Amino acid sequence: TTLGVIDEARARKGSRMRIAVVGMGKIGLPLAVHYARGGHTVVGVDVNPRVVALINEGVEPFPGEAHLAEYLPPLASSGALRATTEYADAIPGADAVVMVVPLVVDDQSRPDFRVMDAATRSMAAHLTPGTLVSYETTLPVGTTRGRYKPLIEEVSGLVEGRDVDVVFSPERVLTGRVFADLARYPKL
């Protein structure tokens, strides 16, 4: 199915889930809309208050994504999808957290993890047992297991595999056609 790891968590939990999406940019917002259209309650986190305000008003913050201007308004007005700048408002009690924070690469093609590290720390500080954390940003091989699993455990005090599940399921979509790609490409 198109929801991948979210479907796995849903099967364990029941039909409707509370999903937090961290990073409401050109990939994160369409993913959040996709989950909300699937019947889930979604809270998005973004550091940009302007983006958060526009999403909550049902206004597309960055034009160009096919169908986003059509799908977003009814989800925002119904409360199925909302956004916040506060991790404490989105993460506690979430069944799944989807990390879609950009990973910047410097001029020598080295990844700069500072933004993702900060987002992971902020998310982990509010993580509750039973949550699935899925990294969907494209990351170097081994980063989820070697960098983010230990960081989540350190900050949250929770143990991966016992208290929380941490997975890597990179997005396979392109901006401008996210909804079509989600329907077209299966996810693990």
Language-model region placement:
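NAD(P)+-binding Rossmann beta1-loop-alpha1 motif at the extreme N-terminus of oxidoreductases
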Residues: 6-60
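Short mixed-charge
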Residues: 62-77, 155-165
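A structured beta-alpha segment of the ubiquitous adenosine-cofactor-binding alpha/beta core
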Residues: 67-95, 105
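Alpha-helix C-terminal capping/helix-to-coil transition sites in glycosyltransferase folds
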Residues: 92-93, 129, 184
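Short, well-ordered coil/turn residues at beta-beta hairpins
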Residues: 93, 99-101, 136-137
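Dinucleotide-binding Rossmann-like beta1-alpha1 core, especially the glycine-rich loop
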Residues: 99, 165, 172-188
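Rossmann-like NAD(P)(H) cofactor-binding subdomain of soluble oxidoreductases
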Residues: 105-172
